[in-house]
Amino acid sequence: MASHAAGTVTIANHASQYTFGEYNVEDSSSASALARGNYIEIVGNGTASNAKSNARALDWNGNEYLNGYIYVGCGNDSTNGTRIPHDI
């Protein structure tokens, strides 16, 4: 099983996992590196090795975890959307 990491200091530490962006937080699953972890995809938005962060993660059940807001009704340039509140 293969994994793929793209970007700056990104780590895909489990089977069939894809990470991209910059300085992601690694999947914390205790599974072997040859087995599936908690997430199939992780998008890192950290700024340094001591300031890792994930913008988004997608688990194997299709659940998506966001570290930010969702905007809807945006223009073609991804601006001017309506922000969805966290407490819906």
Regions found by a protein language model. Name each.
Residues 1-72, 76-85:
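Periodic small-residue-enriched repeat registers in elongated scaffold domains
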